[in-house]
A protein has these predicted regions:
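Acidic catalytic/metal-coordinating carboxylates
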Residues: 39-43, 66-69
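Short amphipathic alpha-helix used as the core "switch/output" element in two-component signaling
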Residues: 46, 68-80
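Active-site beta3 strand of CheY-like receiver
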Residues: 51-57
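Receiver (REC) domain active-site loop signature in two-component systems and cognate sites
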Residues: 62
Length: 138
């Protein structure tokens, strides 16, 4: 868990299905991360522009914008943000497209708690160096 002198990392979870959002939140919050929920790609982009987000989890299939489209647009706003795509269609084409857009990883649905946590921790360590402590308060 994050210590009192550190703010927890914030994880943006984007999925049009509230059950899927809640399932991912139930995995990452007990590990000490703060979650921000979005139900669409447009909402996710607004959140990334307006709030401090340290990692993003996107569903592949959402109305109006796919997870890949969100990822592509996001790269113009925050090129370094680690992004993980969550999809029931984890085929070679989707995976190749995701990595071309610099996704950190692709997690197949239904999600596995251990896979999600392991992938989140690895992404945070790679970008920030500390998977639990978060950022030091100013």
């Amino acid at each position: 868990m994050a210590s009192k002198e550190h703010e927890p990392y914030s994880i943006l979870i984007t999925d049009e299905d509230s059950g899927s959002r809640d399932a991912l939140r139930a995995i990452v919050e007990p590990a000490g991360y703060r979650t921000i929920l979005a139900s669409s790609g447009e909402e996710a982009l607004d959140i990334v522009r307006d709030e401090e987000v340290h990692l993003a989890l996107f569903d592949m299939h959402m109305p109006r914008m796919t997870g890949l489209e969100v990822l592509e647009m996001l790269r113009s706003v925050n090129i370094l943000l680690p992004c993980i795509l969550v999809t029931a269609d984890a085929n070679e084409v989707v995976i190749r497209q995701a990595f071309k857009l610099r996704a950190y990883s692709v997690i197949p649905k239904p999600v596995n708690k251990n896979v999600v946590l392991h992938t989140v921790v690895r992404a945070l360590v790679r970008v920030y160096g500390d998977p639990q402590g978060g950022l030091a308060k100013d």
